[in-house]
């Protein structure tokens, strides 16, 4: 790609096996859109490749936890842990929105605001806070949960695995420096692979299937 400074245009050539296949001429205001388009194309390619590699080989949540304990030293967080409390709160919100939105009345489904309107955005954020408060006040048996939080630590890095055994929900998140993030990215991919998917998950493109695909092409 050739680039010129100032207000000059940039010319991008995307090559193919038989020579250039696409040529884009972009001014300064179009460069970001061009880069986003290229990123989207790369992601779609990675996703398609990941989907081809997936086969039905599921394991249970309990088996996945034991695998992570044996291989990575996974430990369970106490119910008083601040991370446990926060993740359980988020899970309750998600479950109420998915399973019992009628309990929230007009707060159940909020239209997205005009992002160019600061007042509308602030009003939307206020509604989100009101919805969170309303969900927090609902009794826990509205959406029964059996939530557990597990952790893998590496220096200052941390990987968290949240599991609800009633809803068969597994989520992974991690943080840390660059080295820890690279390590945990591979760990998360390995855990999602081990948890796996069933033939029905593949056929129906279930949430479990989508999570695995996302992990493999991230």
Where are the regions that the model predicts?
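Amphipathic alpha-helical packing elements
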Residues: 2, 6-36, 40
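Conserved mixed alpha/beta catalytic, RNA-binding, or beta-rich assembly cores of soluble enzyme
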Residues: 36-218
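Intrinsically disordered, low-complexity segments enriched in polar/charged residues with Gly/Pro
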Residues: 1-2, 138
């Amino acid at each position: 790609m050739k680039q010129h400074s100032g207000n000059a245009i940039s010319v991008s050539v995307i090559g193919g096996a038989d020579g250039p296949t696409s040529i884009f001429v972009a001014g300064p205001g179009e460069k970001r859109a061009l880069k986003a388009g290229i990123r989207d194309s790369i992601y779609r390619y990675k996703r398609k490749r990941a989907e081809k590699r997936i086969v039905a080989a599921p394991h249970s949540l309990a088996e996945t936890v034991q695998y992570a304990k044996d291989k990575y030293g996974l430990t369970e967080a106490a119910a008083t842990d601040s991370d446990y409390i926060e993740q359980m709160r988020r899970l309750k919100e998600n479950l109420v929105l998915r399973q019992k939105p009628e309990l929230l009345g007009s707060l159940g489904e909020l239209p997205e605001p005009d992002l160019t309107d600061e007042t509308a955005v602030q009003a939307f954020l206020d509604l989100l806070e009101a919805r969170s408060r309303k969900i927090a006040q609902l009794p826990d048996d509205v959406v029964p949960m059996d939530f557990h939080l597990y952790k893998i630590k590496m220096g200052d890095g941390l990987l968290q695995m949240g599991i609800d055994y009633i809803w068969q929900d597994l989520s992974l998140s991690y943080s840390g420096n660059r080295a820890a993030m690279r390590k945990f990215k591979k760990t998360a991919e390995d855990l999602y692979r081990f948890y796996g998917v069933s033939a029905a998950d593949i056929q129906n493109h279930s949430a479990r299937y989508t999570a695995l695909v996302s992990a493999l092409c991230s």
